[in-house]
C-alpha cells in the first residue's frame, strides 16, 4: 500500500486510528491466506485475530525492510503452523455444506452445468492445495494465490529467492500430479 509507511509512523507515535486503518487494509488478505493454509474458516478467523493482535503489539519491531504485508504473512504463517500442530491427533474436521472460500463461483449468467463444473474444479483445487506438504502449500499460496513477488514470498518464508523458486517448481509439479490423480 502506498502510504503504509506514513500510517506506520503515525501508529508508532500512538495514533490508534492509524493502527486501525493499517490493520483493516490488510485484514482480508491475511484472512484469505489463513483460509488457504488452515483449510477452514474457523481456524482462519482465529489466525486473523492472533495475527492482527500480534502485529498491533509488535508494530514497533517492524523494521520496514519488507512490505508490511510480507511481515503480516510471516506472523500469520507461524499462527497457522501452531493451529495445525494443535489439530494433530484430533478427529477429522467435518466440512461445512457451504463451498470453501477458495472455490471459484462463476456469475449467474453461466449455465448451471458450467457453474457446477467450476465449483467442483474449485473444490478439487482447494483440496489438492490443502493436501500438499506445508512447505509446498506455503509457497503456492504466497506466490500463486496471494500474488507476492518471489522476493517478498522468500522473505515471508525466510528462504533465499533461489530456494523459493526451486520449492515453487516442485510444489507446482506435485499439485499437478495430485490434480491429475483426482481427475482420474
Cite the ranges covered by each PLM segment.
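DNA-recognition helix of helix-turn-helix
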Residues: 77, 81, 145, 150-151, ...
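Arg/Lys-rich amphipathic alpha helix in sigma70-family domain 2
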Residues: 60-64, 74-95, 110, 118
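Short, charged helix-capping/linker segments at alpha-helix termini
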Residues: 12-21, 31-50, 161, 183-184
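Structural recognition of an alpha-helix C-terminal capping motif at a helix-to-coil junction
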Residues: 46-53, 66-78
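C-terminal edge and immediately downstream basic/flexible tail or linker adjoining helix-turn-helix-like DNA-binding
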Residues: 10, 92-98, 103, 118-119, ...
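Internal acidic/polar
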Residues: 1-4, 90-115, 149
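Sigma70-family region 2
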Residues: 12-13, 39, 50-67, 85-88
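Helix-turn-helix DNA-binding module
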Residues: 45, 127-163
Amino acid at each position: 500500500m502506498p502510504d503504509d509507511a506514513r500510517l506506520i509512523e503515525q501508529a508508532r507515535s500512538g495514533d490508534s486510528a492509524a493502527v486501525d486503518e493499517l490493520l483493516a487494509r490488510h485484514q482480508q488478505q491475511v484472512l484469505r491466506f489463513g483460509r488457504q493454509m488452515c483449510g477452514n474458516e474457523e481456524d482462519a478467523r482465529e489466525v486473523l485475530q492472533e495475527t492482527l493482535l500480534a502485529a498491533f503489539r509488535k508494530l514497533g519491531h517492524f523494521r520496514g525492510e519488507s512490505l508490511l504485508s510480507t511481515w503480516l504473512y510471516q506472523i500469520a504463517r507461524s499462527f497457522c503452523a501452531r493451529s495445525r500442530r494443535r489439530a494433530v491427533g484430533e478427529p477429522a474436521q467435518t466440512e461445512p455444506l457451504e463451498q470453501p472460500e477458495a472455490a471459484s463461483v462463476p456469475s449467474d449468467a453461466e449455465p448451471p452445468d458450467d457453474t457446477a463444473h467450476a465449483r467442483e474444479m474449485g473444490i478439487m483445487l482447494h483440496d489438492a492445495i490443502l493436501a500438499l506438504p506445508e512447505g509446498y502449500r506455503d509457497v503456492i499460496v504466497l506466490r500463486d494465490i496471494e500474488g507476492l513477488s518471489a522476493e517478498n514470498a522468500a522473505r515471508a518464508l525466510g528462504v533465499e529467492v533461489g530456494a523459493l523458486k526451486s520449492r515453487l517448481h516442485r510444489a507446482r509439479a506435485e499439485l499437478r500430479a495430485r490434480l491429475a490423480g483426482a481427475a482420474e
